[in-house]
Structure formats: structure tokens, C-alpha cells
Design a protein with these regions (language model features):
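Enzyme catalytic cores with a strong preference for nitrogen-chemistry domains
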Residues: 1-354, 372-381, 413
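ATP/NTP-dependent adenylation/nucleotidyl-transfer catalytic domains that generate, transfer
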Residues: 13, 22, 30, 168-170, ...
């Protein structure tokens, strides 16, 4: 059974765009079909249902729209829907013709629990090609006016918003079909006025290539407006005299297509909308400026419910699931890193780039980037000096892989054994050589940095940092040790993505030797190798056993930084994403650990070396993340303590 959690409290609602079967001009039949669909989806915990344009009459009635009988039938059908909606916890948008002040309007009726919340008329009427809407209808008014329809007094106007009292993030607006195709769709103003969800009631006939264009419009508008966008398309039952309708239903959120039905499939698009995310996106975007002038807000009630998400929640949000997209992403990141490093080496007139090579993942990626930077500059790979600096915890495996990797890439390889230097340093500060504490570990890291810096200084070189984004978030770096460099090429790359980039290079390099060593590096446990090896010479100190699985920390990092979600929401998302892989107690324990370390280790991030931004999440104190080094985590930890596993 899927994990269920309080959806409203965490900004989620379930929404659907459906195309009920209809009969042209048979309002009684159509109302019955709509009521059936409304009840069906209410039982499935759908809280927002969008139906097509003229769902009560059919879009293809043509001159029948001028008949009193059809208009009365549509009003009676709406009255039946209103009555049937009583006691249902769902908001429904239904398309119908409305006569007002002697003119006809193409409207979306917004229905909730027996109440007609409002009528939103179509603004842009197509009168070209196969469309002749101006023959029957006029464009809707912006400022809402009072109207009586289906036995209720309500408002009619395009500038209407519908707000849920129980969830401030749920603010609904509507537009109709051609409105989306217009140069400036009404939804632009709706979103600036506060709408987080736009529902489009449509009757878009199907022609060759149109579904792809329709999909692009919906996704593009949701991205531009930082909103969720529902698109319900007319389908089976419309007249085929001159057109065919495919029922192509879509739901997009901030540019991402969440649900997309195949044309003519007769299916509904159903998913959950993360409205909390929309609010977060807007408050971060300083060019998204509110403008509420001329708008009227109608409030409605929906009881909070719990949901098990049907929308996918990736365990690896930094890593694309599609193989082709992932490969494209890896190549782009490598280019960003290489171009950034090349510019810095060129600007500093560095004679060489110096890297501490451990045989681990991060230094491996940094070396791959450095070689690419040399190609950008037209320089020999020999201008990159890779130094291995073995000490107490270095294994034969990592030492061997470091050398093989350097030979395969054609860089200059060197070794500086720091064991005696570290022992001498221990003697200087009175550190027992058999006391394996944090000083024991940090001394080695700082000596390595000292060697790298002085080697670079002596040879006119430039120290290239290897630490990744995940390590920076957790503070898994020695202050003024591996924390310091002259340019950190991996600073914007999370650990889960580092693995895939190295795998990508292994798959595309064309060298059996290079591929072999890269695969073995990928298979090596992540470790700083600062504690003595095990008796069998293998790695004794494994990072993920100490700070937690990187796939969890990268998951937490993504939602903390990218969207500013609360600890509770992140925990619920983790329960959904890692269901069956990690026990709830484990997820919560590592989430607490993440927040403890993230706050405590900010002082290291406050003085980071320069490094290129590669994605939407980064920790540069000069760029995306500015946080005081002495901030308290009390509120976050208190929220975590209230969670029940």
C-alpha cells in the first residue's frame, strides 16, 4: 500500500482533466455524464476537475446555440449538476453557453458543493479557419457583474479568482480554449493576480501536428506563469461534420508535463499538483510582480485530506531518468566545468593545473574536467599535474587507480608520501599517532593542501579543488584543508550526479584502459581515507556509513535549497520516493542529521573558493545561497521532532 500523508498541509491537491462522452445538443444526457464523472473522481479524492468547453451542449452545436430550447436545456443541466455536487468535496469547471443582457457568452461555470461560485466567459473568440464563434458569441467582460443562473445569484467576468479557505496556495482561475492561443492569454493576468492553477476548458479539433503544438503551449504557459495548468479537450461525441475532436487532456506544472493522454484514447489526465512549490517559485522570482487591480476573489471550502501521490517523486532529483537526457546533461556539465576552469587558468597565466588525486570519484571528475580545460585552451594534458599523497589510510586499490587514470589521460603524475610529514606535525602539536580523532584526520587533509599549494606556488601552478556540492552541504571537508583551493570545479555537482558523469565518460571515452579504471573507481566505496586501512588492506573508513547515504542527502539538499520546503514536507516526499528501500526511522534519522550538519557547517561555505554553477542548486556564498554562519536550526529540528514514523 502506497504511503499516504496530509496533502493539504503540504501543498498538494489532486486534479483531473476529463472529456466525458456527450451527445450534441442533448443537455440531459450530457449532464448525466458529467454528474457520473464528477462522482467518480470525487470518490478518487480528486479535488479539482476540469471539463471541456461546452461540455453541457457540445461545442459543435453551431446555430443551435441561438435556440432558446438549447439555452434553457444548458441551464437546467447546470442546475442538475449543482444539485448533484452537494456533499462532494470537489471543484468542477463545466463549459456551457450563457445568455446575459441579451447576448451569448461562452462560459466556464465553477461549481463546488452545490454552489455556483462564478462564471468565467471566453475572452478571445476565434473567427478564422474552421471556427466561427463570433457568429454566436461576444467576448467576455473583464470586471465581474452580477447574474442569476440555474436558480443562483453569482458573478460573471474574466477577472474572477476562486480561493480555497483551507489552502491559501490553492487559487483557481479559468480561461477557454483560444484564450491560450492569443498573444497575451488572460491567464497571464490571472497568474499575476494570484492564481496558482489555471484551468482551460477547450474544444480543440485534431489535425496533423496539433497535439505537439498544444502540448508545447500548455507547458510553456505553465512555465512562464509559474503555475499549474489543466487543459480539458472535447472528445468523443462531438459532431464530425467538418472536424474531429480527440480528447487530448493535459496537466502541466511549471513547465513540466505531469499528465498527457493520447489523442482519441478517451482517458482523463489525473495527477497531484504541488501548489506549495508554485508559491515558493514565485516568491523567489523577483520579476514576478503581483497585480490584483480589477480582480474579485470568491472563496470556497474543501476539507483537508490525505493522499498517496501518484505523480512520480524521483529518488535522484539531480539525475534525469531518461538515458538520452542524462547523457546530454552530463556532457553539458562537463563543458560548463571545463570552460570555467579554462577561463580561470588563462586569466591567472597558470603554467600548470595541480590536483590532489586520490583514486576516488571527486578527484577523478576534477581531473577529467582539467584535461578538457586544456583542450579548450589548446594546451597539452601534461600541463595538468596530478599528485597522489598516500598516508595512513591509502589503499593499494585507490593508489593504483590514481596512477592508471593519470597515465590513461596523459597528465603529469607525481607522488608525495606525506606520512612522515604528518607524523612530524603530530609531534609539533602533541597529537598521539594512535589517537584516531578529528585532529588525526584533519592534519592529513591540511598537510595535503599545504603540499598542493606550495607545489603550485613553486611551479607557477594553480590548485584545482575537487570537493562536490554534497560534501559542501554536509560540511564533509576539512576547513582550510580539502575545503580550500584556487578554483573548485565540482562545487556545483552533487555526489549522485558525479557518479553518472564519470559513468558517462566511461561509456563514451573510446579507451578500454580509461573505461576500466573509471568503472573500478565507480565501484570503490566513497572514503576520505584518513583512518588506517583494515587488516586486509581495504578501506576502513566509509563516508556513507558515517554521514548517511548520499542519495538521501542529495534528495534532502534538492528540496531544501531548490524549493525551501519544510522538513515535514521533505520527509513525506522521501517516504514516497524511497518507499520499500529505507525504513521511515532511517529516513527521519538522516534528515535530522542533514539539518544538524547543514546549519553547523555553514562557516565553511561562507568562504568557499570560486567555482562554476552548473544547476539550479548551488551553495556559493556569492551567488545562490547566502546564510549566516551562526544561524540556529531550532525551528527546523522542532518540526522534525513532531513527525511520527
Amino acid at each position: 500500500m502506497k504511503y499516504s500523508f496530509p496533502a493539504f498541509e503540504n501543498g498538494f491537491i489532486r486534479a483531473a482533466a476529463a472529456s466525458p462522452a456527450l451527445r450534441v445538443a442533448d443537455c440531459v444526457y450530457n449532464a448525466e455524464q458529467i454528474i457520473g464523472v464528477m462522482r467518480e473522481y470525487a470518490e478518487k479524492n480528486v479535488q479539482l476537475l476540469c471539463l471541456p468547453e461546452f461540455a453541457l451542449t457540445g461545442y459543435t452545436c453551431s446555430d443551435l446555440f441561438l435556440q432558446d430550447t438549447l439555452l434553457r436545456g444548458a441551464e437546467d443541466g447546470l442546475a442538475a449538476i449543482l444539485k448533484a455536487s452537494q456533499g462532494l468535496n470537489i471543484v468542477v469547471l463545466v463549459g456551457l453557453p450563457v445568455r446575459y443582457t441579451g447576448k451569448l457568452y461562452n462560459c466556464a461555470a465553477v461549481v463546488c458543493n452545490g454552489e455556483l461560485l462564478g462564471l468565467v466567459p471566453k475572452l478571445h473568440l476565434p473567427n478564422y479557419g474552421e471556427f466561427y464563434e463570433k457568429r454566436h458569441f461576444i467576448s467576455g467582460m473583464a470586471e465581474p457583474e452580477c447574474i442569476e443562473l440555474a436558480g443562483q445569484e453569482t458573478l460573471i467576468g474574466t477577472n474572477l479568482l476562486f480561493a480555497c479557505r483551507q489552502m491559501p496556495a490553492f487559487v483557481l482561475a479559468a480561461e477557454i480554449c483560444e484564450d491560450l492561443w492569443a498573444p497575451i492569454p488572460p491567464s497571464c493576468a490571472h497568474a499575476l493576480a494570484g492564481a496558482t492553477v489555471v484551468a482551460n476548458l477547450s474544444a480543440s479539433d485534431e489535425t496533423v501536428g496539433k497535439s505537439a503544438y498544444r502540448r508545447a503551449l500548455v507547458c510553456g504557459q505553465s512555465a512562464r506563469l509559474l503555475c499549474a495548468y489543466l487543459y480539458a479537450d472535447a472528445g468523443h461525441g462531438e459532431s464530425t461534420t467538418d472536424m474531429t475532436f480527440a480528447g487530448h487532456n493535459l496537466i502541466a506544472e511549471n513547465g513540466s508535463l505531469l499528465a498527457d493522454t493520447a489523442p482519441f484514447a478517451g482517458e482523463a489526465a489525473v495527477t497531484e499538483l504541488d501548489l506549495g512549490r508554485m508559491v515558493q517559485e514565485r516568491q523567489r522570482n523577483t520579476t514576478f510582480m503581483p497585480e490584483t487591480t480589477g480582480y474579485t476573489t470568491v472563496e470556497f471550502d474543501l476539507p483537508p485530506i490525505s493522499l498517496a501521490l501518484t505523480r512520480p517523486v524521483s529518488c535522484t532529483p539531480f539525475v534525469p531518468q531518461d538515458a538520452a537526457t542524462r547523457a546530454e546533461r552530463c556532457e553539458l556539465i562537463l563543458r560548463i566545468q571545463a570552460e570555467g576552469l579554462a577561463k580561470r587558468m588563462e586569466h591567472t597565466h597558470a603554467k600548470c593545473g595541480v590536483i590532489g588525486i586520490s583514486g576516488g570519484l571527486d578527484s577523478c571528475l576534477a581531473l577529467l574536467v582539467a584535461v578538457r580545460a586544456c583542450k579548450v585552451l589548446g594546451r597539452d594534458a601534461k600541463d595538468i599535474v596530478a599528485l597522489t599523497m598516500p598516508c595512513f589510510g591509502t589503499t593499494k586499490r585507490t593508489r593504483s587507480n590514481a596512477e592508471i587514470l593519470c597515465e590513461a589521460l596523459g597528465v603529469t603524475f607525481g607522488e608525495i608520501n606525506i606520512t612522515e610529514t604528518v607524523k612530524s606535525h603530530f609531534a609539533d602539536i602533541g597529537q598521539p599517532a594512535d589517537k584516531y580523532d578529528v585532529t588525526f584526520e584533519n592534519c592529513q587533509a591540511r598537510v595535503r593542501t599545504l603540499e598542493l599549494m606550495d607545489y603550485a606556488n613553486k611551479n607557477g601552478g594553480f590548485v584545482i579543488g575537487t570537493g562536490d556540492l554534497s560534501e559542501l552541504a554536509l560540511g564533509w571537508a576539512t576547513y582550510n584543508g580539502d575545503h580550500m583551493s584556487m578554483y573548485g570545479v565540482n562545487a556545483g555537482v552533487p555526489k549522485t550526479l558525479v557518479r553518472h558523469i564519470v559513468q558517462y565518460v566511461a561509456d563514451t571515452c573510446g579507451s578500454d584502459t580509461l573505461r576500466g579504471v573509471l568503472l573500478d573507481i565507480l565501484d570503490t566505496p566513497v572514503s576520505p581515507e584518513l583512518l588506517p586501512t583494515a587488516e586486509d588492506g581495504t578501506i576502513a573508513q566509509q563516508t556513507e556509513k558515517l554521514v548517511g547515504p548520499y542519495e538521501l542527502h542529495d534528495f534532502y539538499l534538492y528540496y531544501v535549497l531548490r524549493f525551501g520546503f519544510s522538513p515535514a514536507k521533505i520527509y513525506h516526499l522521501a517516504r514516497t520516493a524511497f518507499d520499500g528501500k529505507y525504513e521511515p526511522e532511517v529516513l527521519l534519522a538522516w534528515l535530522k542529521n542533514f539539518y544538524r550538519r547543514f546549519f553547523a557547517q555553514q562557516f565553511k561555505r561562507s568562504c568557499l573558493p570560486d567555482g562554476p554553477k552548473v544547476g539550479s542548486v548551488t551553495l556559493s556564498p556569492r551567488g545562490d545561497w547566502r546564510m549566516p554562519s551562526d544561524a540556529c536550526n531550532t525551528l527546523w529540528m522542532a518540526e522534525l521532532e513532531k513527525l511520527e514514523v
